[in-house]
Amino acid sequence: MEARVMTPFTYFSLPMQKQFLANQQAVQGKPYAEFFRSKISVPLSAVEKIQQGPMPLADTLTPSIEDLNRMLAADFISEEAGYALLPGPMAYVQSRKFFPNCTAEMLKWWFMWHPLEAERYTLWFPYAHVENPCVHHERLSDTTLSFEESLYGNTFCASEYVGDRLMHLHIHFRDPCELGFCPDLYRESKIDGSVSALMSLAHEPQVPVSLMAHLFKECPEGLYLTSRYWVGSHPAMQRFPGAERAAQLLEESGLGEVELETLAYEFAVHDMCEFNHLASILPSLHAQFSGAK
């Protein structure tokens, strides 16, 4: 088992504190209410990485096809946490999270199970998550479909706090190779699953303002989830239809260069909290509610 020092994460914006209280009330009476927990623990090493401030640009990846595929290289090991502002402007977040005693099947199950009720989504990050309905929700519970058939080409409509900003987002999941990953490299890297996506603001769903790469791979003690977030405008995003409008749309939405750098920091904190918290509850939650023997 990987040796890690975990520390409580205790600072949440006032809107997030109020959202926690609302979520706490809403989850009462649900069979999974015991998994709604106020304590969020994160790796101390990840906190210390984020506290160092923005990363040097030389250590970042862009959303280019070339940089995406660097994530699949045999010698690629992601840093645990970090954020930066790329030219564009574009918010950048990187992370690598360890899920002890978890399997790829557990994480796939989570993405099929949690969007079916808003209260399930709040288990993931009780202070930040509001709801995450799925456009084609019937596909999530269709046992004749594979995980990939259920998720890819489907859209989650997430409402969540990132810092003190309530964001309404459409997360358009795609086959990773449609996003730029090389099929041969993806196969050779033995990735166990991807929940990668394009993301748009809810009021302009045809304008991708973000690319998210989430790749997970099992190890003897559990699994690792390696993630990259790019939010904003960048020449490499032009391969996605509508992305040429991203800079103007974000500026109109109050996300200029200064705000995007703040968003990068807040997304780094959000990612650290939500996925480490999910890792702490997923094995028991899956055992109780998946129906798996």
Curated annotation (Swiss-Prot):
Q: What is its EC number?
A: 3.7.1.24
Q: What is this protein called?
A: 2,4-diacetylphloroglucinol hydrolase
Q: Which reaction does it catalyse?
A: 2,4-diacetylphloroglucinol + H2O = 2-acetylphloroglucinol + acetate
Q: Which gene encodes it?
A: phlG
Q: What single Pfam family name could you report for this chain, choosing any that match?
A: DAPG_hydrolase
Q: Which InterPro entries match?
A: DAPG_hydrolase (IPR041526)
Question: Null mutant: what phenotype?
Answer: Deletion of the gene slows down but does not eliminate degradation of DAPG. Deletion does not alter the ability of the bacterium to colonise plants or promote plant growth.
For binding Zn(2+), which residues are annotated in this chain's numbering?
A: H129, E160, H270, E274
Sorted alphabetically, the keyword list is: Hydrolase, Metal-binding, Zinc
- Name the lineage: Bacteria, Pseudomonadati, Pseudomonadota, Gammaproteobacteria, Pseudomonadales
Q: Per the entry, which co-factors are needed? A: Zn(2+)
Q: Which family does it belong to?
A: Belongs to the DAPG/phloretin hydrolase family.
Task: Identify the enzyme class.
Answer: hydrolase
Gene Ontology molecular functions? hydrolase activity; metal ion binding
